[in-house]
Amino acid sequence: MASVAGPEIDRLIQLLARLPGLGPRSARRAALHLIKKREALMTPLASALQVAIDRIQICEICGNIDTRSPCTVCTDMRRDPSIIVVVADVADLWALERAGATNGFYHVLGATLSPLDGVGPQDLTIDALVSRAHDPRVTEIVLALNATVDGQTTAHYITDLLGEANVKVTRLAHGVPVGGELDYLDEGTLSAAMRQRTPF
């Protein structure tokens, strides 16, 4: 298909299409919207991207993304130092923070173990987690990993490694979501909910 715009606009569309959730058609729409709102949107976006390029870092303690290291979470003295919540990636950390689900600290693994994708223990920050678990202030490691085969494999692997640390290892409950209807849930979720039922 012949290009109807210059190479710079084509390049913008190609780059936008690389973003998660944006295919070629959505990327074209986004590019047109940015161009139409050049002063109100495109210029501030370009500036924000440049600031991100210049200032964003990975936290040396937990692996969070922030403009400083240690990050805002790790330097928050109001947090409970006895809890470390283990997540696969930064998006999971941010989701838990939005929910206000914990006042503990975090540890970002970077992914989950996935032999099919070539992701092994050496590709994750598991050694740093084990080191952190030996801090005498830490009493609980919460495995907040996805309920997938890779997530569960990672959880079992970490649990085995933490056997010598003097910490309690817990994981998130699995089951019926708040507002969920049983008829719409898959069998695995229903089975997990029945096995992990609690007193009412």
UniProtKB/Swiss-Prot annotation:
Question: Which PROSITE patterns did the record assign?
Answer: RECR, TOPRIM
Q: Does the keyword DNA repair apply?
A: yes
Q: Where is the signal peptide?
A: none
User: Which regions span the lipid bilayer?
Assistant: none
Stretches assigned to coiled coil? none
The family database entries (Pfam families) matched by this protein are listed as: RecR_C, RecR_HhH, Toprim_4
Family named by the database record: Belongs to the RecR family.
Question: How is this protein named in the record?
Answer: Recombination protein RecR
UniProt lists the gene as: recR
